[in-house]
Amino acid sequence: MKRKTAEVKGEKERNSKQISLEEDKIKGMFNPKIWDKTFQDGLKKEIEDSQPYNWGTIHELVNDDLLRAVRKEIETEIHFTKKETDIYRVNQSGDLANLSGLDWDDLSRLPNLFKLRQILYSKQYRDFFGYVTKAGKLSGSKTDMSINTYTKGCHLLTHDDVIGSRRISFILYLPDPDRKWKSHYGGGLRLFPSILPNVPHSDPSAKLVPQFNQIAFFKVLPGFSFHDVEEVKVDKHRLSIQGWYHIPQVGEEGYIPGEEEAWVRNNTSTLAQIESNVLEDFEFPKDERNILSFHEVKHFEKMLKGDAGAKTDNTPKESMTSVISDSVKLSEAEFTYLSQYISPEHLSSKGIEKLQKQFVENSSLQIESFLNDDKSELLKKVIKQKELEQECPYHSKDVKAPWKTAIPPHKARYLYIDGKEYRNFQTEADILEALNNNDLPNFQFTKDAIKIISDASGNSRENNFDAELALIDLAVFHKSTIFKKYLALLTSLCPVSEQILIRRFRPGMDFTLATKCRFNELLKSNPDIIDAVLEGTLCLTPSAGWESGELGGYELYMMDDDEDNKQYLKEDVEDASVYRADDSGDSVLINDPPAWNTFNLVLRDESVLEFVKYVSWSAKSSRWDVKMKWDVKSCDEDGQEDEA
């Protein structure tokens, strides 16, 4: 009996010793400092006090030889493919997009990478991480890592990492171990404060310049943990391993029944926020179109129905001549007015007939040399002058009237003029004031205000508003009843509402993410209103070199396949974020790079997504355009128009 007891005791001692040796081996692969209680408490305090939310970083995290070996394995054994969507451009490993999907029985190619994965998800390290971040217990069975390399032009736009059961996000950096990664290279991790929950500020308040063997991490905070990866600006590659720690799973220490389900149910991903109306109150400019007057709409209806000459009992015997003709052809006065801006070939009967045919066939138009030579040359001159002589503001607080900054930045960021009162959204109070005092667009008022500012500041280069004034004149032209009649002629659709924005997308800064069109709730009860939005984009970008797409800035329309996207969302949890726009090209309907003097017209229904791709730091100028949207009704008694 004693002998058997001694054998059992000896076996326990051997197992305990083996576990202890294994634990020592794991700890030995990390920097010894992280196991020191004083270091842990100091790091915990740093994280608690950090801004804009709780985050931390550790230099020289793991054994240097191990990480160098991992880097060598990745560079020699893994093939990377460039992937691009509306939110990112990055090089991902084709066979190792998610390390948890690897067949770990075959370790011959990547033994050191496997070892790194083991220690990062070891109980010892998870307990350390859970302690310093105050995240509690973390799952060791639900591993979630991906390998990315950021080369010149690569970027990842603002998001909060809220997907599924993620509890902590981390990035382990592996750039060249023998050279310092400098701030001007780009590729930094930038953290954004929040004006309100789910409404990040336009500008980051913290930036980490990554170095070899450095880890950055933060607790995933729905509505607050917004961050991005700055575009890499030089011909160097910034290798990194992105990963997440998840809520404990069934059978693991710290597992709480129903915790994960409640977390997923109560916390909305960035993508879901963009698609829903949850952000609607906090979006500026709002996707709202102002309803046109009865006076305007009646002319378009008469023209499209072909009853311009019809008389009613209320028709005066001596009818007055209207400034706006109801004829299906342009009057001499209308032709003269439109000729101030539009090229003559697009105003002739033959030119209009050609455009009408194209729109009927495609539900879209692309018109080159839309503006006449005089207006085109004037606009190019003042826009180039603006680019060359005036420094463009890159911080939202520095953006002055008449420009505003689009928010929130996990949906869009660009400069715009909307004909409304000047706003600069820095605080919750700024947003609430705008919501409480909503005004209608008045570009003439904006123009008058600019002249007052210009006169008060003098005619210096820094206060030259020639570009703004010329663009506002263009917006006034597009708002005119005669231009909308021309639009109705081209499309056989009757405009009933409108929105016009002058936009500037700055290099290294601006974009819009893919969204569906929103219909005007006030018009839903009208059965003649088409379930689509007519969108026009007059692109006025003065620089060249956009055709390849490498500089971004292109406007892209693509099909939104719900079933494909459900599968995409399911499969893509390994990516740093999840967004609909794929890079296969199969669903792309229209891809228009920035150009000079091109007018694109698209009838878009809710099955079509649209975005303007992030403009690269390498672009020679901003992307400039005038964006127009109209709700439209059909005057065809046989039925509605077909949408693209």
Curated annotation (Swiss-Prot):
Cofactor: Fe(2+); L-ascorbate
Binding site residues for Fe cation: 159, 161, 227
Major place of residence: nucleus
Subcellular location as annotated: Nucleus
EC number: 1.14.11.-
GO cellular component, one term: nucleus
Gene3D superfamilies noted in UniProt: Oxoglutarate/iron-dependent oxygenase, C-terminal degradation domain, q2cbj1_9rhob like domain
Chain's role: Prolyl 3,4-dihydroxylase that catalyzes 3,4-dihydroxylation of 'Pro-64' of small ribosomal subunit uS12 (RPS23A and RPS23B), thereby regulating protein translation termination efficiency. Part of a messenger ribonucleoprotein (mRNP) complex at the 3'-UTR of mRNAs. It associates specifically with components of the translation termination complex and is involved in both translation termination and in regulation of normal mRNA decay through translation termination-coupled poly(A) shortening.
The protein's assembly and partners: Monomer and homodimer. Interacts with FRK1, eRF1 (SUP1), eRF3 (SUP35) and polyadenylate-binding protein PAB1. Interacts with ETT1.
Protein name listed in UniProt: Prolyl 3,4-dihydroxylase TPA1
Organism listed in the record: Saccharomyces cerevisiae (strain ATCC 204508 / S288c)
Organism ancestry: Eukaryota, Fungi, Dikarya, Ascomycota, Saccharomycotina
